[in-house]
Amino acid sequence: MKKILALLVIAPLLISCSGKKNTEVNEALVKDTNGFEILMGQFAHNIENIWGLNEVLIAGPKDYVKYTDQYQTRSHINFDSGAITIETIATTDPAAHLRQAIISTLLMGDDPGSIDLYSDVNDIQISKEPFLYGQVLDNKGAPIRWEWRAAHFADYLVQTKLQKRTSGLHVIYSVTIQLVPNHLDKRAHKYLPMVRKASEKYGVEESLILAIMQTESSFNPYAVSGSDALGLMQVVQHTAGKDVFQMRGKWGKPSRSYLFDPENNIDTGTAYLAILQNNYLGGIQNPTSRRYAVITAYNGGAGSVLRVFSSDRTRAVGIINGMQPGDVYQTLTTKHPASESRHYLVKVNNAQKSYRRR
């Protein structure tokens, strides 16, 4: 809730920064997905007012984006492509703004709850165990743990790798840092103990949990989506989160801060997989067919999976039980009404195969 309230606070600030009239935001909207989407749309619009057309960049499931300096400097980590881009439109000493943002980004910790992605406050705490440690090597080929090394690398980048481009009325200065080739594996390794714990607790395959995490967030603990799915496994508070709380006999739904904790997120996401596997889709007898259904349901819901086969849920389960697993896979990847869910099954299934081979 803290970060949602921050959006309410900064919306008028962003508008004033860009010279636009303040627009009132109804706090009641934040209680549902539509409200969050409206707030995010406003946030994106206000970033456009500051940075210009075609320069809107906001955090996503596989993109960490943090603004500082009255929204004139930003750090972007693309966890899919493996690139960090630090940019500024500051007109006074842009190199200094870039340098500070580089240092802060390289040394940030892995606690998403401590960083507000929607504020321009530089609330990034220098960590003794940086999240990017081992994922970035400096110009001497060394990993970066200490502030002095990050500062030396920042100086090197600003002096030798500075780029400049013009976009609209702005001159944008930037530097780009490549993550190491196996950055995905390094992030996955961080969470293996948590994955193993959740796997044993709920009876869900480790390989499936890892495949879901890779597909949902590329192991980005700061992951957010336009529909307010949160964290490594992109758990939605009022759907999967609520179901898990009900399973535990708890009222309500998990908080945003709860789901931004990596261990809580993995535990909740895995618990939801177990609910799908054992309850909603537990009548599917073949374990491979059930796994295909569970994967698709994690993305689009159990009801939509069963409706692919029949509008009657009991009959749908019977139809699936009369099919070969390969036919179930073919049906879900070609006849599910949502293209995202069709592609999701393909992606997760392929990722799971790679984790099973390790």
UniProtKB/Swiss-Prot annotation:
Main function: Murein-degrading enzyme. May play a role in recycling of muropeptides during cell elongation and/or cell division.
Keyword check for Cell membrane: no
Catalytic activity: Exolytic cleavage of the (1->4)-beta-glycosidic linkage between N-acetylmuramic acid (MurNAc) and N-acetylglucosamine (GlcNAc) residues in peptidoglycan, from either the reducing or the non-reducing ends of the peptidoglycan chains, with concomitant formation of a 1,6-anhydrobond in the MurNAc residue
GO molecular function ontology, one term from the record: hydrolase activity, acting on glycosyl bonds
Membrane topology value: Lipid-anchor
Lipid attachment site numbers (S-diacylglycerol cysteine): 17
Signal peptide: 1-16
This protein's GO CC annotations: cell outer membrane
Localization, UniProt: Cell outer membrane
Gene: mltC
Lipidation (N-palmitoyl cysteine): 17
Pfam families: Mltc_N (PF11873), SLT (PF01464)
Swiss-Prot/TrEMBL keywords: Cell outer membrane, Cell wall biogenesis/degradation, Lipoprotein, Lyase, Membrane, Palmitate, Signal
Family: Belongs to the transglycosylase Slt family.
Enzyme's top EC category: lyase
GO biological process, one term: cell wall macromolecule catabolic process
Assigned EC number: 4.2.2.n1
Iron in keyword set: no
Domain of life assignment: Bacteria
Protein name, per record: Membrane-bound lytic murein transglycosylase C
Main location: membrane
